[in-house]
Curated annotation (Swiss-Prot):
Function of the protein: One of several proteins that assist in the late maturation steps of the functional core of the 30S ribosomal subunit. Helps release RbfA from mature subunits. May play a role in the assembly of ribosomal proteins into the subunit. Circularly permuted GTPase that catalyzes slow GTP hydrolysis, GTPase activity is stimulated by the 30S ribosomal subunit.
Protein's gene: rsgA
Lineage: Bacteria, Bacillati, Cyanobacteriota, Cyanophyceae, Synechococcales
One Pfam family it belongs to: RsgA_GTPase
Family matches, as Gene3D superfamilies: Nucleic acid-binding proteins (2.40.50.140), P-loop containing nucleotide triphosphate hydrolases (3.40.50.300), Probable gtpase engc, domain 3 (1.10.40.50)
Domain CP-type G: 78-237
Organism of provenance: Synechococcus sp. (strain CC9311)
Binding of Zn(2+), residues: C262, C267, H269, C275
Family from the record: Belongs to the TRAFAC class YlqF/YawG GTPase family. RsgA subfamily.
GO biological process, one term: ribosomal small subunit biogenesis
The name this protein goes by in its record: Small ribosomal subunit biogenesis GTPase RsgA
Keywords recorded for this protein, A-Z: Cytoplasm, GTP-binding, Hydrolase, Metal-binding, Nucleotide-binding, Ribosome biogenesis, RNA-binding, rRNA-binding, Zinc
Amino acid sequence: MVVLDQPAQSGMVVALQANYLEVELDQVSELIPSRLLCTRRTRLSHRGEAVYVGDRVRVEAIDVSHARAVVADVEPRVSFLTRPPVANASTVVVALAVDQPAFDPDQASRFLLTAERTSLAVQLVLTKTDLLEPEALERLRVRLQAWGYPPLLVSTFSGLGLSELKQRLAESSLSVLCGPSGVGKSSLLNALIPELDLRIGSVSGRLQRGRHTTRHVELHHLGAKARVADTPGFNRPDLPDDPRNLEVLFPELRVQLEQHPCRFRDCLHRDEPGCGVTRDWERYPIYRRAVEDLLGLSRPSRGG
């Protein structure tokens, strides 16, 4: 039966299931289940107000016997990621494999650019480190540090780095774990939270692409106060709309501009005469291609 005299409860959306929202309540009670399957108030839809995993919400009309309720209001968000869609995250963890699938600098940069666009803390994690010889792994670590991302090296096979990763995730209220398919995100979460027992996929030998095992965003507890969002893998994040926004998304370019500001406000740091940006950093060709791609997309097509 619906408990009409129960006061409204606050909680967090921890998963989406078809047209339903799974909400975990803040206050544990013997009278009310800790998790409720909820619909949305019609007025939220009329206002065009979407509800996402990570949203803080108020639920009412609680049906104790069936663990159902209705989301009545959504609290203002402190942050929002568009892909994967997660509200109120504090850290973005980009997971990239050193092998199987092979490390791809262009793909890695796309994910790091997407993470930088959130203005949240970014942590780079290299997975499957047991597949590389120590010398090769050290070269990759130094390389990524030069990009501006000191990586955390982990292996679910040897256990390398798992304790440090768990500690760092526990320091963030909500971390979003993202990365290409097949890099081992589900394996990582299984190692960090064994009771999850998430399904693990494999990597296509021909395409070197992982097979999606996570189908939707879901939050999992990691310690008393921290949560981590498991997200579906995808292989080609989008670039920002405006090429002028790219310069703040590359840490190595940001450092250059802080030390030696370019005298041209609208400079894209390509071949502009007098541009003070040097070209002797590894990802400059990636930056350059991204600018060219965006300029190509922004040009109006000429009809015949």
